[in-house]
A protein has these predicted regions:
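Sec-dependent N-terminal signal peptides of Gram-positive bacterial secreted proteins and lipoproteins
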Residues: 1-11
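Long C-terminal interaction/binding lobes of large macromolecular proteins
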Residues: 188-210, 228
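Short, non-transmembrane alpha-helical segments in secretory-pathway proteins
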Residues: 10-37, 86-98
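Exposed beta-strand-loop-beta-strand "reactive/processing" segments of non-cytosolic proteins
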Residues: 32-66
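Charge-dense, low-complexity polyampholytic segments
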Residues: 64-76
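A generic structural signal for short, solvent-exposed coil/turn residues
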Residues: 27, 44, 56, 127-129
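Metal-dependent nuclease catalytic core centered on acidic motifs
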Residues: 73, 78-189, 212-216, 220-228
Length: 228
């Protein structure tokens, strides 16, 4: 496989590597993928990277790394699909919040060799027990009291006993939150731009330990002040 990726002059052939990446992803998942960018091989690395998305899920762009020798691909597609399901569950858990919210979830150490995008949270954690999740919640605060919010936010990780990580809380206008949504849903990862966009919206970060959010009304009040 590797030899075919080098042209007659001994140079790496980007076009062939893009095709190899697309084929590797399709064989791994049984889905069709589009490669949007070839990033090449960084100095000293034994793999190259591409930007890609599944045709069935263009809203989930990701970065895939393909081993130069074996052609094996490692990527966060399974993790990102799982994060989407976690976000949906969180929205249901805190549905009693009266204000409009936006939730998205990201994972640390998200790139895997796992092949089932529909894997359950429990099975995922058996395979990737060190994974920690960041659940970002943006609130367009209008009517909810701090007590109501604190009570509901305690339910964020209900149903995810082994979930560890953090709840990151923000508040903003509808326009600000929509801007964040567009950014989060169009980038492989959160970069410096995300920090800049959310600096003025950020309220605080609260630990999640084995599915329990460590948050009190007092802590929420102290961090949020009069912004909630």
């Amino acid at each position: 496989m590797a030899a075919a990726l080098i042209d007659l002059n001994g140079c790496i052939n980007p076009a062939l590597q893009k095709k190899q990446a697309e084929k590797a992803l399709e064989e791994k998942y049984g889905e069709s993928f589009q490669i949007t960018n070839y990033n090449g091989v960084a100095f000293g690395d034994d793999y190259y990277t591409v930007n890609a998305y599944a045709e069935a899920h263009p809203e989930i762009p990701f970065l895939a790394a393909v081993d130069l020798k074996s052609g094996v691909v490692s990527d966060p597609y399974v993790t990102k699909r799982l994060c989407g399901r976690i976000s949906d569950k969180v929205i249901g858990n805190i549905a009693a919040i009266k204000d409009d919210i936006y939730v998205f979830t990201e994972a640390v150490l998200d790139s895997t060799l796992l092949t089932d995008p529909d894997i359950s949270f429990e099975d995922y954690m058996q395979e990737m027990p060190e994974t920690k999740f960041y659940i970002h919640i943006f609130i367009n605060h209008q009517t909810s009291t701090k007590k109501e919010l604190a009570n509901e936010l305690l339910k964020v990780a209900n149903g995810f006993y082994k979930l560890n990580g953090s709840l990151c809380l923000y508040t903003g206008t509808e326009e600000q939150i929509n801007n964040v949504r567009e950014y989060a849903e169009s980038n492989n990862e959160l970069y410096h731009e995300f920090q800049t966009m959310t600096d003025d919206l950020y309220i605080g970060t609260y630990k999640i330990v084995n599915g329990k959010v460590l948050l009190t009304e007092y802590e929420l009040t102290e961090m949020a002040g009069d912004r909630l």
